[in-house]
Amino acid sequence: VAIDPAVTNNETSDETGIVVAGLTTEGQYYVLDDVSLKASPDTWAKKAVEAYHLWKADRIIGEANNGGDMIGLLLKQVDINVSYTKVTASRGKQVRAEPISALYEQGRVHHVGVFEKLETQMCEWTPDMAKSPDRMDALVWALTELSSGGSSMIALASMSNMCQSCGMPSPKTATICFKCGTQFNEQ
C-alpha cells in the first residue's frame, strides 16, 4: 500500500493518493486497488490501514517530502503494529515514473478492474502541470517498492474469492466484492 499524502483538507487540497499493488513470483505486477480520497490526515490514515489489512499487505509506503514523520505517527495511531516505510523523493516525478512506465511498456503491469481517476491521471499528466498527480504518485511508489525487491511476492491464487463480475481478486475472508458489490455466494 503506497500513500502520497495531502497534509491539508480544504476545497483546494489535493487528494491523498492511496494505491494497493502486488507482485507475483512470475514478475507480473498487479494494481489491486485505488482508495485515494480527499480527507483529513486521520481519515486517510485509517483508509490506508484498512487497505493494508484487507489486502494483507507487507507494508505501507509513504512519501515523506510533504508529510515528514507525520505519516508514520498517524498510521501508528490507527494501528501500532502496521509495518511502515518512509520514502523521500530526491528526483522529479517524471524521472521517478520512467522505470514504472517501462514496466507498463513491457506488459508486466496489470490493472485488476478499472481505476478511472488513476488511469486518467496517468494519461493526462505532464511535468509542467501545477496540480499534483496524487494517485499516480502513489502508484509509482507502490510499484517502485515492489520492483526494488522491498516487499515479498503475492500469490493471487491464495486470494480465493475471484469476482466473476469484475475480475477483482479478494481476500479469502471477503463475502462480497468490494469493487462492484457482487456477493460471492451469488456467483
What residues fall within each predicted segment?
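Residue-level signal for mature regions of secreted extracellular proteins and peptides
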Residues: 159, 170-173
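Alpha-helical elements of the RecA-like P-loop NTPase motor core of helicases
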Residues: 69-73, 98, 178
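Conserved beta-strand -> loop -> alpha-helix junction used to position metal-binding or nucleic-acid-contacting
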Residues: 81-103
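RNase H-like, metal-dependent nuclease domains and their acidic two-metal-ion catalytic environment used
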Residues: 1-87, 109-163
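Short Cys/His-rich "knuckle" micro-motifs
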Residues: 172-176, 187
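Short Cys/His-rich micro-motifs in 6-15 aa windows
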Residues: 181-187
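Short cysteine-rich clusters marking metal-coordination/redox-active sites
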Residues: 163-166, 177-180
